[in-house]
Structure formats: structure tokens, C-alpha cells
């Protein structure tokens, strides 16, 4: 494939946009550099770039797209609402309707508030938990990404009883000292951290199924034990379901796993491709948010009618029978084919799959926690990424990310993808 126009536009972009991208994950730095492909439009499972190349898309905007690009039902809903106005600054019927549909799908959301991003949603749940418990410290799990607010850009200390350090310039040490980071799926480390800091902890922040170092499921009993220990110390459990809500079934991962938090942050999929975030949970906790309580959260664009209408339309598509069963079937077809090719070419790799989402890791370890992904073969992934891109398969340019299937992918797309993998693996020996 030729990417002449993408390369030209990237040079132009560098003149005006810092680093040439509006989010660092869009650069190709993690896969050896080069100009990222500039896309012009998307339809269904496909993206089309400025050079006229067509791609089967498994990036799907890092997770928000589950019904394919430019889904006609969602597109029409957005167009109809845009004709009526995109922002009023007042309450609307749409936000009531959307909240009702969300609570019907995720019963733990006794009360709901909308914001504009997953970062805002997580940031606010932390503030609410602190207001409710009158404590300051937070526990998070290594490798889980919870947005770019100061409190969650914190690296692990040298052990479970050690406080964190800033994971980004501009995050004060004083902020990092309010955060403890422990390994996911390691209940003993969590026990140790709570034993040391539990009386000061406001909440633990958990991805119930991890989506930010690939797709990683909790070990049996892990989430249940986290809930038990957390509540024993009077702290709250916050689930970050920004990636997982409506990804695996019509509802949240908590319902699938039958383990429930006190508060939930959500976003991505529920906006139908438009900017959105939200949070909700137990009524007695949520009542600490203004205007009923002292914890402040506001937003000019929060609950805007365009995002609300898109979200309603998205749920109308997903609530149809058979949607998630088909995603699971496609995911299994892709996984089975990848495993067969790994064996055929003697590639050192493993796969984690959760329904219609999976990650291919270049390691022989079964992935259960972040350090294993950190130590996986990044050079092999970078080579694989470029080989796939040049065959028209669009993946995330990072060994930490998942492949996302949509309602618009077909068996033929999977088969074409596997042909590309077959060739890529043949060039990696």
C-alpha cells in the first residue's frame, strides 16, 4: 500500500498540531515511528484513508464503536437532533429517557449523572467517594488506564504498602502520595495494601474486566474478595466500565460477573460515537453531588441533546436479539484462526479473548496482570502491526490494546484478516 498523502498531511499536521496528533495513542511511536494513516471516512467495519486505501478496522476508535462506522440508525438520529439544535443549556426529555434505559440495563445505577468523557467520569467518582467517606487515598491496579486526571496518572511504588509516584510530568508528588497501586488479580497484595492504608482509603478503582493492557479477566473470586476487603475497611468500590459497559452484553460487566460496585464510571460505547461519559451508583452516595450535596460537578456540554439522542439510538440497536451472540461467534472464529496460525508458524504468542474483543500478545505466558504485557515482545508486535497495516488491516499501534469486533464485521472479514495474519507470521520467522 502507498501512504503518500498520509505522509504529506502528517508533515502539515506537525506545523499546527502538537506532535501531529490530538492524542498520543494515535502516533506510531510505540511501533517504531512513521506517519500515522490519515483516515477520510468509515462505513461499517471499514475505514478509508486519504490515499484511497481500504482497511478492515479492529481499532474502532479504541472502543466506542460497536455498531460499525456511520450506522444508519444512529446517523439518522444524530441528523434529526442536529436539525433541532445541539445544545440548550437546559434539561431535556432525552436525558431522562437515556438515563431510564441505562438504569434498566445496569440496575446498580440508582442515580446517574452525565459528563463528557471517561476521564471526567472517573475523576468525579473519586471526588464523590472522597466526599462520602471523608478520606483521601485511592487504590488502583497496575496497568489500568483511567483517563488523564492527576490522581490516576500515578505509577506503582516498590511494594503494596508503598505510595505511588507521578507517572506524568506535571502531576505533583503530593497528589501521587494519595494513590496506592497494586497488581491486578493479586489478592494478597491488595490485602497487604489495605492492611497498611485501609483506614485512609476512600475507594478502590477497578476495571472488572481489564481493557487497557489487552483483555484480561479477573481470576475466580478476585472481585468478590476485593469487595469484601474494601467494605470491611469502610471504603467504596468504583468500577471503571468506560470500556466494558455494553461491550460484552446488553449491560455492564458487573452484571455479567454478578459482582457489584458502589459507584460506576462509564463512557465510550454509550455515546454512539459522540463524546460522552457518565457515572452513577447507590443513591445515598450519589446524593453527595451538587445540587443535593457538597461534592461539585458541572459541565456546559454535560447531557447535551446530541449525545443523548445518539446514545438512545445506540441502545436501540444493541437491545435487538442476537447481537452479542454474533459478536461472540465472530470473536471465536478469529481466535481459533489465530491460534491455528500461531501453531502453523511456530510464533511465540498467546491470546486473551472476551466475547467479541481479544488481544494477541507476543509472549508464551497466559496474561493475568500488567507486568507480563510490559515484558512481552514489543519489537515483534511492531513488525506485525506494520505487516498487517500494509495488507489493509487496521489495528491499534500498541501491544497493550485490544482488537474490537462490531456488529458489522462478517465471516468474510475474519477470513480475510486471517489470510493477512498468515502472511505476516510467515515474514516474522
Curated annotation (Swiss-Prot):
Listed pathway(s): Porphyrin-containing compound metabolism; protoporphyrin-IX biosynthesis; 5-aminolevulinate from L-glutamyl-tRNA(Glu): step 2/2
Q: What's the superkingdom here?
A: Bacteria
Which reaction equations make up its catalytic activity? (S)-4-amino-5-oxopentanoate = 5-aminolevulinate
**GO BP terms, alphabetized:** protoporphyrinogen IX biosynthetic process
Disulphide bonds annotated for this chain are none
- Stored Pfam families: Aminotran_3
List, alphabetically, the InterPro entries matched.
Answer: 4pyrrol_synth_GluAld_NH2Trfase (IPR004639), Aminotrans_3 (IPR005814), Aminotrans_3_PPA_site (IPR049704), PyrdxlP-dep_Trfase (IPR015424), PyrdxlP-dep_Trfase_major (IPR015421), PyrdxlP-dep_Trfase_small (IPR015422)
The cofactors required by this protein are: pyridoxal 5'-phosphate
CDD domains linked to this entry: OAT_like (cd00610)
SUPFAM superfamilies reported in the protein's UniProt record: PLP-dependent transferases
Q: Does this UniProt record's set of keywords contain Transcription regulation?
A: no
The first-level EC class reads isomerase
In the UniProt record, does the keyword Cell division occur? no
Q: Which UniProt keywords apply?
A: Cytoplasm, Isomerase, Porphyrin biosynthesis, Pyridoxal phosphate
Any idea which residues bear N6-(pyridoxal phosphate)lysine here? 268
Q: What is its EC number?
A: 5.4.3.8
Q: Which protein family is named in the record?
A: Belongs to the class-III pyridoxal-phosphate-dependent aminotransferase family. HemL subfamily.
The subunit field of the Swiss-Prot or TrEMBL record says: Homodimer.
* Name under which the protein is recorded: Glutamate-1-semialdehyde 2,1-aminomutase 1
Query: What species was this sequence derived from?
Result: Staphylococcus haemolyticus (strain JCSC1435)
